[in-house]
Amino acid sequence: ERLCMIGVTGTNGKTTVTCLVKHVLEQTLGAKVGLIGTIENRIGDTVLPTERTTPESFALQGLLRQMLDAGCTHVVMEVSSHALALHRVDGIPFTVGAFTNLTEDHLDFHKTMEAYGAAKARLFRLCRTGVLNADDPAYRTMLQGAACAPLLVGTGKDAALRAEQVQLAPDHVAMEVREGEKAAHVRLGIPGRFTVSNALLTLGIARALGIGLEDACRALGTAAGVKGRIEVVPTPGRD
């Protein structure tokens, strides 16, 4: 309860979104942010080993205690469907929960897509605000029985935070982000159409935490790519 907890669930994009959110919070709030996820656990700039996307309940609580003692005010974490189904995050009062997408995966554990989606939807009974990718129709499944206030992001008319004038390039994406009458431009050095969704979710989380749209876009534009996620490798002698 003494930490601002941000949880991100979905089949793909969790690692990228959590890393981008950590960067934006550090740049805009000057906060010390803990990170829990697939690639690494991190307290500020200190890297800790990781065994699974979301630790077991006892280990998770110990890690959160360690982050609090180290001066963290915010924690952004990947929340896997296994963790939700096995109640590893029960009792954690998430300030914000976010949904990236839902595609076929982990059916050895969940057996059906319905059970898989229902497991991920549990996050939105544990958070105050839900930031959801409205470009994936499964966002409606996430909101069934939800206890949170939803904030939809995407490229369609249903999105409260919407990407317009999207430009896709080999080494970046650029877009105008509109929220009602407000608009801001962002250029992010991670290529791929999915980067649009990841960027919007990051900005939606920032907005849910009270960070201004322009400030969030400016901070996001300074983010580097995520290790092992669509890293651009220059080839000498070729454009």
Positions of the model-derived regions?
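Phosphate-binding loop of NTP-binding sites
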Residues: 1-134, 138-149, 179-182, 206-209, ...
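Adenine nucleotide phosphate-binding catalytic loops in nucleotide-utilizing enzymes
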Residues: 110-117, 144, 148-239
